Amino acid sequence: DKAGYNTATIYNYFEDLEELILYSSIDYLKIYLKDLRNEINSDMKAIEMYETIYKVFVHHSFEKPEIFHTLFFGKYSYKLEKIIKKYYEIFPDDITGQTDITKSILIEADIHNRDIPVMKQMIKEGSVLEEEAPYIMEAIVRIHQSYLENILQQREQISLEEHKNKFFKIFDFLLNFNN
């Protein structure tokens, strides 16, 4: 009020509270990026990288389900690509130190497309069959979304550790189906 603004002023810049939350949630990606940078190394096979990316992603998303659901599955998640590109223009150091594959994943805001670069490398290395890759990616994204929504709906009744373990049993099953 002292600055001459009130809560209605926010709606000159954002469609509603959920869009404002989307913008403010980007900051949570910094912690995820730092942890990812510490876990990934360029000597990893693509399948190891993919597993590590998801271990870090699941850890952060299950700990902050409201934030990650808003970012990747919320009402305005379609705006995330524009927001992320702008964010990395302003804060390029946040992506420094990531491998090329993880950089391409981080820049890709559409959760359904973000795994494509690492999946292509997995196909090249023989870890996944090309014709099965799109189904594996889609299944993993949908299962993650489902688990995230379960946490949002039943936070008090759910053990996050147990939820993570169940998710990774399915994840490992999908990746090791042909091996």
Residues covered by each model-derived region:
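Helix-turn-helix
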Residues: 1-19, 23
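Gram-positive cell-envelope targeting signals
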Residues: 5-12, 80, 87, 98, ...
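Hydrophobic alpha-helical connector segments
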Residues: 23, 38-74
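Short alpha-helix boundary/capping elements
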Residues: 62-65, 76-80, 141-148
